[in-house]
């Protein structure tokens, strides 16, 4: 269950147009008390070089602004500082985790970490993607759907990013379209927001604090008596469940459990084993991935490396063909045009048919 801690020391928009390095201690006097933070000095940026512009997003744990770091346009996430010493300690711990995890994983489908500062505000600086969130993009597109090869391409981007996190022992716990950002040309997707991420170990028991119900795995909240702060066992397969919901959404462009409130969706998924309906026009291969991701038993869900392999196979068959070259010609490495003979074209056609037949047998 996510915990919203509001920054009571500042009014809406107060950070906009400000330089972080200026004196901006909070109303409760705790903003500068950061001696317990243990972040490598090489990860810190000079707050005097940060300038906060307009707000571009907001989550449970902070606000995100467009800004500038030196001469570079960046995204600046200002974390809530809490209104009590206890809140401050908890939020500092989350800040440390997020910075350390973002700094150690690098992938083309993960938002690039630039740096952080801890005084006078807890701030994380990342690359700024000029596109929009996947959530907003899908909403703007409705009632139309994504083209199939685009939807699968986005899903592959997400699965590759998650595979990288899991390979580094990190559970994201908040995988949803709001935390997925499009590049400027809308060609690919990058995963953002490590605010709820956790490092995974075999013996660790993690808190029930989690992301948004509609995308959450049932094992995160299925114990009725579980109170905030209590411990509960789960593993990285909670991200696989969330991915299954996101993949369904990419293919249908519908809100999961759209007829239900958040709590109704949680109850239906956890106690009635309900899942969003899979339309008939979704291929059996994609339906299989979705259903295997959100199966009740976490141990039966696939790994992201398996999901990546399956999606790659499907994408190969649905990707749009490149425009034909004039007169069945192909460009050679030295830039000259070489024409394919009729027998050569027939040979390539035969190879494509052979591959399709082999794949069909494997699926049976």
Predicted regions and their residues:
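Regulatory alphaC helix of protein kinase catalytic domains
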Residues: 95, 99-100
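Short beta-strand micro-motifs within the conserved protein kinase catalytic domain, predominantly
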Residues: 112-120
């Amino acid at each position: 269950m996510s915990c919203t801690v509001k920054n009571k020391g500042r009014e809406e928009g107060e950070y906009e147009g400000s330089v972080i390095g200026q004196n901006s201690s909070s109303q409760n006097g705790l903003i500068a008390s950061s001696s317990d933070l243990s972040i490598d000095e090489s990860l810190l940026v000079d707050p005097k070089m940060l300038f906060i512009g307009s707000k571009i997003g907001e989550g449970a744990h902070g606000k995100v602004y467009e800004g500038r770091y030196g001469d570079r346009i960046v995204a600046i996430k200002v974390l809530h500082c809490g209104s009590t010493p206890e809140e401050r300690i908890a939020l500092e711990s989350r800040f440390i985790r997020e910075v350390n995890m973002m700094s150690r994983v690098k992938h083309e489908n993960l938002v690039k970490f630039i740096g952080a500062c801890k005084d006078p505000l807890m701030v994380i600086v990342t690359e700024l993607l000029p596109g929009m969130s996947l959530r907003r993009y899908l909403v703007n597109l409705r009632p139309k759907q994504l083209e199939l090869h685009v939807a699968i391409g986005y899903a592959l981007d997400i699965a590759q990013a998650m595979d990288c996190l899991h390979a580094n022992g990190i559970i994201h716990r908040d995988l949803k379209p709001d935390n997925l950002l499009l590049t400027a040309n809308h060609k690919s997707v990058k995963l953002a927001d490590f605010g709820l991420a956790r490092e995974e170990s075999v013996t660790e028991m993690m808190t029930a604090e989690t992301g948004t119900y509609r995308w959450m795995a049932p094992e995160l909240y299925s114990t009725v008596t579980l109170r905030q702060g209590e411990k509960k066992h789960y593993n990285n397969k909670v991200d696989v469940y969330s991915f299954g919901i996101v993949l369904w959404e990419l293919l249908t462009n519908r809100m999961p459990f759209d007829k239900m409130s958040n709590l109704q969706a949680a109850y239906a998924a956890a106690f009635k084993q309900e899942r969003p309906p899979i339309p008939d026009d979704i291929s059996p291969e994609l339906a299989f991935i979705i259903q295997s991701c959100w199966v009740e038993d976490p141990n039966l869900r696939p790994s992201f490396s398996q999901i990546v392999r399956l999606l790659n196979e499907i994408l190969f068959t649905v990707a749009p063909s490149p425009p034909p070259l004039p007169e069945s010609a192909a460009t050679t490495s030295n830039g000259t045009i070489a024409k394919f003979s009729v027998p050569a074209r027939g040979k390539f056609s035969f190879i494509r048919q052979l591959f399709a037949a082999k794949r069909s047998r494997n699926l049976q």
